[in-house]
Amino acid sequence: MRKISKNSPPALLTTYKKQIGASYDDIDKNVYDATLLALLNEQGWVCGYCQQNISKPQNATIEHYCEKSICNGTGGTLDLRLDYKNMMAVCPGKATNDTHCDEKKSKFNPSSGLPIDISPWNTAHIKAIRYTNSGTIKSSIVRHDLEIDKILNLNVSYLKKNRKAKFVSLLKAAGEISSKKGKDKLKRILNDELVIGNNRYPSSFPGMCEYMLKYTK
């Protein structure tokens, strides 16, 4: 995960919310598409949870951080179903038989851990995240570590494998990082990974790349 800085909602969504009887379930396609595009642009076209690259809008969906079934204005809850600040773009959540991100999260309910507490919009939450050279993502906050592992399933085998491959390849490309020359080279490589061109990161896992900058100090 990486810190997401929220922008203003797209004008189409703002206008739609003002309509009498506006609801997310009946949202117009053009409003949905504009909202998804805005979310992808502010996230650099990577999934808000696992940070995999998203190549096109058809490979993404809008995720409600606090579920529509929970934050729906009933039982004393806020109605966040059309709140842009409660939305993010996510990947399909599956490439194997096992699911992750919002696909895995949808299997849970208020009695089994929802809504989650770890937030990609909270700087302190993101700073508590660390990555290992095995591709594992962890948090020093116990509850968040459980959410990462169980509810979001971000350590599913293929994600770990892909993170490990990138982690190792970046270090290998830098050479000997115990030297200043190696550290400087790694820093340049990582900074290139964090450059957003045309609203897009060049590849997956920018959050891990940002974390790896610690090896350059």
Describe the residue ranges of each PLM region.
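Short, charged surface segments at domain edges that flank catalytic/cofactor-binding sites
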Residues: 2-49, 71-82
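Secretory pathway export signals and precursors
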Residues: 43-46, 87, 97, 205
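A structural signal for short, well-ordered beta-strand segments and their strand-loop junctions
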Residues: 46-49, 61, 89-90, 128-131, ...
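Histidine-centered nuclease catalytic patch
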Residues: 52-109
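Conserved, surface-exposed functional patches that form binding/active-site neighborhoods
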Residues: 102-177
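C-terminal, charged low-complexity interaction regions
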Residues: 143-217
